[in-house]
């Protein structure tokens, strides 16, 4: 049984895993429908977004993000193995604007809606603000948000703000 965080990490099997590693951390990496820079983008992802690598074909990797979002990313912008630990996370740290909070118990306990697709008419689900989640990417006017169960959903960018510090 591992006694330290480092020992625990050493036991984790990172085979087939990578993280987004753009040399410009303010930029994001496209997930594309085909292994071609001109194909449709399914979103752009921040540094340290974890991806499962299903296949590598030349300079492209077919990846899955979360449970079921898959497409192609350029391998030169992915970090593998021990290099993954060196990538700084670029996920934005934002707060939900108060008028979009549902079932409010207090300032840290409330629900909010996320959408199954990046449009306001898509099916929506309530998530709880107290549960851990990450803003991993963007598509159009939506952030892509992933919870610890690897569910990827969408939230309008204008529902979130940087807060008062």
Residue spans for each PLM region:
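Boundary regions of SH3-family modules and the immediately adjacent low-complexity/disordered segments
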Residues: 1-17, 52-54, 64-99, 146-165
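Beta-loop motif signature
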Residues: 5-6, 14-15, 22-59, 93-144, ...
């Amino acid at each position: 049984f591992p006694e330290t965080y480092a020992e625990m990490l050493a036991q984790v099997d990172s085979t087939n895993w990578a993280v987004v590693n753009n040399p410009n951390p303010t930029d994001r990496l496209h997930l594309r429908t085909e292994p071609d820079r001109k194909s449709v983008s399914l979103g752009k992802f921040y540094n340290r977004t974890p991806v499962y690598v299903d296949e590598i074909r030349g300079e492209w990797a077919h990846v899955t993000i979360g449970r079921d979002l898959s497409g192609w990313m350029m391998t030169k912008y992915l970090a593998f193995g021990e290099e993954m630990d060196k990538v700084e996370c670029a996920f934005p740290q934002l707060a939900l604007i108060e008028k979009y909070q549902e079932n409010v118990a207090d300032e840290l306990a409330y629900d909010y809606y996320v959408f199954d697709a990046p449009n306001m008419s898509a099916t929506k689900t309530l998530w709880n603000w107290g549960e851990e989640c990450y803003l991993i990417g963007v598509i159009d006017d939506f952030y892509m948000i992933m919870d610890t169960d690897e569910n990827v959903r969408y939230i309008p960018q204008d529902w979130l703000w940087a807060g008062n510090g």
